[in-house]
Structures are given as C-alpha cells and as structure tokens.
Amino acid sequence: MKNKIFSILQIVITVFFVYFTVSNLDLSKLFEVLNNINILYLIIAASIYFSSQIISSERLRYILSDNKFIISFKQNFTLYLIGLFYNFFIPGGIGGDAYKSYLMNKKFNWKLSKVVKLLLLDRMIGLGVLCCILIGLYEIIFLNFNFIYLILTLCFLSIIGYYMVKLIFKNQNIFWKSFLYSLANHTIQFISLFIILYSLGIEDGYFEIIIVFILSSIFSVFSFGGIGIREYIFLSSASILNFSPELSASIGLLFTISAAISSLPGLKFIISKPDYLK
C-alpha cells in the first residue's frame, strides 16, 4: 500500500514538473537548441553514463558479497539493468529496487528484509558521496576557498558517514571501498555531463553546473527517472548560470535522455529472462 501511494505521488510530481517546465519555455527556441546537437555526442554521453552504472552495480555486488550474499557479475549486472528499466519506464510499478529484491529472494532464497536493507545502504552511500562533493564545490565557489579547511571538512563528513553506517546498518567493513566506488561512479557521470555541455557549446561555468546537476540528482528520487524535476531545477537555475531558460533546461533534458538510453538494455532481460536468473 505504501509503495502504491509513493508511486502515485511520483506520477503526480512528474506530471506537475513536466507541465510547469514546458509552460515556462519557448518550445521553438528549445527545439532550435536541440536541433543543433550532434547525435554522436549524445550517444557518447549515454555510453559513458552506462559505464558509470557498471561501477554502481559493482558497488552493490561488493556490499552484497561482504554480507555473505554471493552473486556473479553477470547475474548482478543483469538485475541492475532490470531495476534501471523499472525505475525509468514503469510508472506506478513496484520500483526497480523492490523488483531487484524480489528477484534476488526468488532466485537465491535470500532474506527479503536483509536484501532491502543492503539496497538502501547502497543508495545512502551514493547519496552521501554526492553531498560531500556538493559541499566541497560550494566551499570552492561561494566561500573563501581554503584547501586545508576543505580537506578537513570532507574528512569529517566521511567519518560521520562511516559511523552512521556502522550504527544504523551494523557494518564496519564496507564503507570506505563503497565510498570509492561511489566517487568513481559520480566522476564518470560528470564526464558524461561534460560531453553534453560540449555538444551545447558550453565551455565555462562547469563548477556551478555540477552543483545544479547534483541538486537535480538528489531531488530526482521524487519523480520517475528524474523526469521533470531535473529539467525544472536547471530551468530555475538559468539566471544563476547566465543561460537562456531553453539552453539551461536542455542540459537536464539531454542528461535525462542519455540516462533513458542507458536504461533500455534492461528491457531485453525483462522480456526474456536469461537462464542464470531462472
């Protein structure tokens, strides 16, 4: 029941922000911006984003294996792709993580509550690293930058994250390696974003754009695949970034499209489940 309510809420939020964003754009100017995009760059951005998901899936596999849930790379990545597709293309469904948990329980007879808890831990570590990057960039751009102070702040936040994982999830071993997995994952996603910016002819203001991107990633959980919210946050940041509303919104839109393209392979495994998952 709770999952159904959350799914309905996600649909409402997605529709609202898509409508609000579109209503505040000159669509002819938006299409003009998109029409100048080299499709090759979008394919490259999507491919790079896809590689970040490989690292993200390996972070989850590491967390699972450390808790005695042994799964092969092929099995885990296939389940990860299925989850990505569910999250992006099936509004009102049970959600990608919930479906992954169900499949793991069915295939490996793993305790469902434990798997759900580990999937939550995986998400929380990724979110924590994003917040650390966000705070670091804020310090660099908006405050009087002090390298030593920045390092001390990030170390302090990392230690807090370590003890939170230890306290809440009763796990002392996985935090630091998972932290590095997350850092690599987000770095590759930033590279994907840079390719999109290059395709739009944007050559400066990258730090500010990354901050907006991180904020859109954090809040994207409230809509399906970040659709609507990501574009709205970029639209709202147009004046800060010194971009036209259409150019700013197109950054979020193109990243959403590249993420959607990267999620499509999951459909193959939903239509025809491989033998190693039966």
Give the ranges of each region predicted by the language model:
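Helix-loop junctions at the membrane interface of multi-pass solute transporters
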Residues: 65-66, 101-107, 237-240
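Predominantly cytoplasmic-facing regulatory/coupling regions of multi-pass membrane proteins
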Residues: 1-81, 130-222, 229-235, 243-278
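Alpha-helical architecture
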Residues: 95, 120, 124, 187, ...
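Hydrophobic alpha-helical transmembrane segments of multi-pass membrane transport proteins
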Residues: 73-107, 114-117, 220-225
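Hydrophobic alpha-helical segments and helix pairs
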Residues: 99-139
